[in-house]
């Protein structure tokens, strides 16, 4: 766990060239399906990076906190390093997997959302502490990464509670091939209103 301190179709090369390769943040609460979705994307030809590996490679991560098992990341330092390192676009479409990925210098953000009750079941099955389960449920309930929305890059979200990883990947591919259409916070899923919103 990381914490902040302060269809497998291939892309059409022609279409990819038109859109341009990007690094895309794949964010969402713990248990929302990020790593599973990332693995399906990897099998379909995407490059996959993780926030944890990037932080480790760039000496931006602390030792594990014995209280909750989290490894605090200096996300400000990491972002500063990557702004320079990522000045050029990647050679392949790249996914940056991690719930802090939307805070890095990515070219778009994919937010995975999950019904809080289903998310609770997933987290409890992992034997997480009550405090860790509750904090992740709260983060999902209030909108998760949308609270740190950056209007300068395209954002979109997908609901993973009832949709299979393969179907979600299909939607992600469609979003990319359709030109990264930009969602806005007011279209996001609102669990308080019963999960309404444009998915």
Regions found by a protein language model. Give the residues of each.
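Hydrophobic anchor at the beta1->P-loop junction of P-loop NTPases
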Residues: 26
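P-loop (Walker A) phosphate-binding loop of NTP-binding proteins
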Residues: 29
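ATP-binding Walker
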Residues: 32
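Walker A/P-loop
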Residues: 35
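ATP-dependent small-molecule kinase phosphotransfer cores
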Residues: 47-104, 195-197
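A glycine- and Lys/Arg-enriched "phosphate-lid" helix/loop adjacent to the NTP-binding pocket
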Residues: 63, 114-156
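NTP-dependent small-molecule kinase module
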Residues: 125, 150-199
């Amino acid at each position: 766990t990381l914490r902040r301190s302060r269809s497998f179709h291939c892309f059409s090369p022609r279409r990819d060239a038109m859109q341009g390769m990007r690094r895309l943040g794949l964010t969402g609460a713990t248990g929302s399906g990020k790593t599973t979705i990332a693995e399906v994307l990897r099998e379909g030809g995407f490059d996959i990076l993780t926030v944890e590996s990037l932080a480790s490679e760039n000496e931006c991560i602390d030792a594990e906190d014995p209280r909750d098992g989290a490894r605090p990341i200096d996300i400000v330092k990491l972002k500063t390093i990557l702004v320079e390192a990522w000045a050029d676009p990647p050679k392949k479409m790249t996914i940056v997997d991690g719930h802090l990925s939307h805070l890095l210098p990515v070219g778009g953000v994919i937010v995975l959302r999950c019904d809080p009750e289903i998310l609770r079941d997933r987290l409890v099955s992992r034997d997480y502490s009550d405090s860790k389960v509750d904090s992740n449920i709260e983060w999902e309930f209030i909108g998760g990464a949308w609270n740190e929305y950056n209007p300068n890059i395209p954002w979109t979200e997908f609901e993973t509670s009832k949709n299979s990883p393969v179907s979600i990947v299909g939607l992600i591919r469609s979003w990319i091939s359709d030109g990264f259409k930009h969602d806005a916070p007011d279209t996001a899923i609102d669990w308080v209103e019963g999960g309404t919103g444009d998915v």
